Structure formats: C-alpha cells, structure tokens
A protein has these predicted regions:
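Bacterial Sec-dependent N-terminal signal peptides
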Residues: 1-23
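Conserved functional hotspot residues at active sites or interaction interfaces
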Residues: 20-168
Length: 168
C-alpha cells in the first residue's frame, strides 16, 4: 500500500511538472500606469527537444517574428516591441484590444514573458493549452501604490485573462 501511494504521488507530480510544456502559449496584454518608455520586454523560450525547431510569434493573428533553432541547451530570446503587449492608453484598458501574443511551435517548449520598467521587473510564465477552459481562479496579495503604504485606499491589484476561443 505504501509503495502504491508513493507511486501515485510521484505520477501526480510528474504529470503536473510538464503542465507548462506545450506547442502553443498565450500572453495577455498589460497596462503601464507610469507610461515608462524605458521598458524592455522579451519572450524567453526553452525546450528539452534535441532537434532544433522554430516558434512563430503572433499578434492579432499576424506573425511579428520567428524564433529559429530552438533546442535543448540553446534557449532563445525575442524582444517584443511595446505596442504589441503593453498599453498606457486608458481607453484600451478593460476593452477588446489587438494587444497580446500567441506563440506557436513545431514541438513542445516552455515560454515566459520578461519585462521591466524603471525600478521593477516581472516574469510571466504561460501554461500553454493546459490553461484553456471556462473556469479561472485568481489569488493575489495586496500591493500598495507608491508612497501609499499607510493609506489602505491606495491598493493596486491586477489580473489578466485572455480568451483564445469564442465562448470560453
């Protein structure tokens, strides 16, 4: 019984460890309240496939770039122009937009979006096709706006969800 439980536990963790390993990945658009033009953003992709392959990067169903020769031991970066992923225009926030990225590879790969502004950086990891569905759960901690740590009304939080298919 103990061996069976250990095997099932191991099997559970192994299947979950590849949840971010897929042939397609999506990144939702983001908003920049500071309108920082010094921001840098890029896609970082890696794989455990030994045969090199390519990954196409789409914005609004148009290819904006291609990563070539992705293979095990040779991760790649692709710098993303700001207008494809980040907006500071208030009319585009909470509205249907043409921002966001869709990555499609010939084989399975891991993908994350890395970006930074003046004094802050983030890494967003895509779950791939395993994130498709109709039920989403969000959990986050409180984040105070700058110079408002004592003001409980100065909270800031963000959740970004992207619909990749109709009726999802």
């Amino acid at each position: 019984m103990k061996k069976l439980f250990t095997f099932l536990l191991f099997l559970f963790f192994i299947t979950k460890s590849f949840a971010q390993f897929d042939t397609e990945h999506w990144f939702a658009p983001m908003a920049d309240a500071s309108n920082g033009s010094e921001a840098q953003q890029y896609i970082y992709v890696s794989t455990n496939e030994s045969t090199p392959f390519k990954v196409d990067i789409y914005n609004n169903n148009v290819i904006i770039g291609t990563i070539n020769n992705l293979s095990k031991g040779s991760p790649q970066k692709f710098y993303i122009p700001r207008e494809y992923i980040i907006t500071s225009n208030n009319t585009e926030i909470n509205a249907k937009a043409t921002l966001g990225l869709h990555l499609v590879g010939e084989k399975k790969f891991f993908a994350n979006l890395r970006f930074s502004v003046f004094n802050h950086a983030e890494i967003l990891t895509s779950k791939g096709k395993s994130a498709l569905g109709k039920n989403f759960y969000i959990g986050m901690g409180e984040q105070y706006l700058p110079n408002n740590a004592a003001n409980r009304n100065g909270l800031n939080a963000i959740a970004s969800v992207i619909a990749t298919e109709n009726n999802t």
